[in-house]
Swiss-Prot record:
Residue spans crossing the bilayer: 1-21, 26-46, 61-81
Catalytic activity: a ubiquinone + NADH + 5 H(+)(in) = a ubiquinol + NAD(+) + 4 H(+)(out)
Subcellular location: Mitochondrion inner membrane
EC number: 7.1.1.2
Keyword Transport attributed: yes
Protein name: NADH-ubiquinone oxidoreductase chain 4L
Organism whose genome encodes this protein: Chlorocebus aethiops
Major localization class: mitochondrion
């Protein structure tokens, strides 16, 4: 296994651990999720460049589109929760009430 893949795997693991540790703060969770998406993007882009298959070349772009949609929805939720409750600490929020 090359050092690049080891570093990308380490970045994904650190982002995953950060997601587990900071799951009660929405902003920190979104940042960790973006770190996971970027490490997945780099991994898929490297695999696409190594295989030279025309079908796999669209996968990194598709992942970036999904990451952008996830970011937009996450930031919209963050703004909505921050405007309503004044904080991003989602552990104390009861989001099921009307």
């Amino acid at each position: 296994m090359s050092p690049i893949f080891i570093n990308i795997t380490l970045a994904f693991t650190i982002s995953l651990l950060g997601m587990l540790v900071y799951r009660s703060h929405l902003m920190a969770s979104l940042l960790c999720l973006e770190g996971m998406m970027m490490s997945l993007f780099i991994t898929i882009a490297l695999m696409a460049s190594n295989t030279h298959s025309p079908l796999i070349n669209i996968m990194p772009i598709t992942l970036l589109v999904f990451a952008a949609c996830e970011t937009a929805v996450g930031l919209a939720l963050l703004v909505s929760i921050s405007n309503t409750y004044g904080l991003d600490y989602i552990h104390n929020l009861n989001l099921l009430q009307c």
